[in-house]
A protein has these predicted regions:
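Short arginine-rich
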Residues: 114-116
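Short N-terminal "domain-start" leader segments
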Residues: 2-87
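A short, exposed loop/beta-hairpin motif centered on an aromatic-Gly-Thr core
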Residues: 90-110
Length: 116
């Protein structure tokens, strides 16, 4: 007997329109139900000229399941944190698998159009 494919949660949080990560501002410039494209610009002067666009990130829409974590140490030991199901913004380990970086908008749009 084969394994059942896990289905995506029926309700989940969407990707944010803007997101700050590692001193960069990410702005969603286009998306479908399958793929999104974000413009990456400098937000922290330690990374260069604030506002300068440095790259475009294209990635498949991946939905992470809801989960809970229990604080194991410190003053809040035993506290439970609940995280809802949500569309996942890629981490470093996801690039080359379901996320890609491009230095021009045209190249990013080409990948976006191939995936949508």
């Amino acid at each position: 007997m084969g394994r059942k494919k896990a289905s995506a949660p029926t309700t989940y949080e969407s990707l944010p329109v803007t997101k700050t990560k590692n001193g960069y501002l990410y702005k969603q410039i286009k998306r479908t139900d399958k793929v999104a494209i974000y413009e990456q610009s400098v937000e922290n002067e330690n990374n260069g000229d604030v506002g300068r666009v440095v790259a475009y990130e294209v990635f498949l829409i991946v939905i992470a399941k809801a989960y809970s974590l229990v604080q194991k140490h410190g003053q809040k030991q035993g506290q439970i944190y609940n995280y809802p199901a949500s569309e996942k913004f890629p981490g470093n380990e996801d690039f080359g698998k379901w996320a890609w970086t491009f230095h021009t908008k045209d190249a990013a749009m080409e990948k976006f159009n191939a995936l949508k």
